[in-house]
Amino acid sequence: MHRGLVGARELVGEAYLADTELRREYESEIAPRTTAALESIFASTTIAAPRRVLDLGAGTGAAREMIRARWSDAEVVAVDKVPGPGILRADVTRTVRPIGVDGRFDLLVAAHLLNELPLDVDGRARLVQNWCRDLLEEQGTCVLIEPALRQTSRDLLAVRDRLIAAGLFVAAPCLLQGPCPALLRERDFCHMSAATIAQGRSRVDFSYLVLRKQGAPCTDTSRFRIVSDPMKDKGRLRLFACGPAGRLLVMRLDRERSPSNQLLDKLERGAVVDIQGATAQSDGLRCGRDSVLVRREN
């Protein structure tokens, strides 16, 4: 299952959940990663308790169960092209509104769905835009999760740019509401991480967007989200950070570590931080002894 969706990806676009063995493997290998990703997103993003939730491409129901556990009073409607217990059959590429689904929703979730649809980036962006237009309440939230592969992540970033151009607001993880700077170089992409789901297992990496119909853009050019793991080498510490000022490499020499910049040692992927007093260089920002770093809420 992992090879079919992440490796050679020969299962992408197939109705693999109709196969009993593959469904069992998906439930044990992939579904827990969906749960971990959603838990991480909901823990770091302010989302009002939803009254109605639509789970698009529900798979084996991991998102539905996680949402019910978090918001027990929510009505959760789940759809997938392969039906299951409590999951309606629906082909989300045929109509914007799945057959049998009425009304609007406070929360839309599409986990590991877009990359499996027979649509190009423009088609995926139009589909998400139509979901938000026809299915989402005015103050609602749409959460998209995709695999943290280079191409699937870059595709999601390209979808992001089109959605922003269409007037939607990216509440997370982006602090920048302009074109994504990670798309400027082919090797760059963007993903976040959740804790490991079991001892001996790798951490859960994922790419995601939290979308709303409107929002207040961040204009503080000193504010950044960390978008890489720490890189320590040759007496220095480096991290990539992204915000209204762009996607920059932040660097500090070990000999310039000080009480005001020591937070850099503790920053993890996804953290939001204000960086004051850093020196602009050709390849990014250099934090010196007098630079001041302050952690902010996500």
Feature map (PLM): residue ranges:
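Class I SAM-dependent methyltransferase Rossmann-like catalytic core
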Residues: V12-I41
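Conserved class I S-adenosyl-L-methionine
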Residues: P50-G59
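Conserved SAM-binding loop of SAM-dependent methyltransferases across substrates and taxa
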Residues: T60-W71
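A short acidic, Gly/Pro-enriched loop at the edge of an enzyme's catalytic core
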Residues: P98-L108
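A short SAM/SAH-binding and catalytic strip from SAM-dependent methyltransferases
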Residues: D106-V121
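Conserved beta-strand signature within the Rossmann-like core of class I S-adenosyl-L-methionine
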Residues: E138-E146
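Class I S-adenosyl-L-methionine
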Residues: S153, L157, L168-V210
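C-terminal lobe and adjacent flexible extensions of AdoMet/dcAdoMet transferase-like proteins
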Residues: S193, S202-N298
